[in-house]
Amino acid sequence: MKILLTGGCGFIGSNFVRFALGAGGDLSIVNLDALTYSGNPENLADLGDDNRYRFVKGDIRDLDLMAELIGECDAVVHMAAESHVDRSIIDARPFIQTNVLGTQTLLDALRRADPGNDKRFVHVSTDEVYGSLPLDRPDLLFTEDTPTDPKSPYAASKAASDFLVRAAVHTFGVNACITNCSNNFGPYQFPEKVIPLFVTNLIEGKKVPLYGDGLNVRDWLHVDDHCEAILAVLERGERGRTYNIGGNNERSNIDLTHQILAIMGFGDEMIQPVKDRPGHDRRYAIDAGRIERELGWTPSRSAWPLALRETIAWYKDNPQWWRRVKSGAYRAYYEQQYGSKA
């Protein structure tokens, strides 16, 4: 199987390339990435001589290029997206351009290149499209039937892209599935995200910026578990079906912070309280029962503290990667996002 992967130089995408190629079988990947701020070709630099892997620099809004690449491949895994909530609050326009217009362009290219609807299309999305759960109802979980209720510009853009994929399935018979995942963690994650942000700050002797009261809850999923689930959906998912992917690993932000501090040998004096994010969702929690029942997938790498310790160790062992990432424009963004909120 030859896969067109969009956004393969990002965090989840680059891990998917490594995981999929390492899984064995007759599989190759064409990685299409525009190399925006979080797309880092260094993530996959060591695969340059692997004949199962090819990189193409390009934009998913380029209809002709997308149709050409889809025509060469057997399936599409669509990960290319703007994904950071805080950036969407600052300026939502790139999120609309990439997540909404880009997804529609990709669907148009798929219809042009695959009029018989033979090629599988996996649209990788987020649990944030479901909105927020109350902290006082731990029994409530997001299921695939939970109404869509996005609360941030980022979540709204991803919800729109999900609806476009569903419309393409219903109207044109596109052979697509949608996945909605919880918060990912692992190696090669851009350090605007909370775990690599906190870990690299502490390595540099800086405090960690904790939003609000720290009681917001997220479900944490190791990126390799996520990649395994995406492969299962790609190979065995039902046309038009949505699959929630979670780690069964709910943690409050303050609990996450304390665990990172403890593993790295720091105390609460390294916490810098900052003004809360506007409209900060209180709790995300995934019911991943459907993918377990129908495709036989369950998370096996997401359990803490081991998975968190291994992730922290990766950032400790790879300072040359994240120090380059945290230079230049990132520092200006960090000051804008956290410096004025302390």
How would you describe each model-predicted region?
Residues L47, D136-R137, P191-V199:
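A glycine/serine/threonine-rich, flexible loop-to-helix segment
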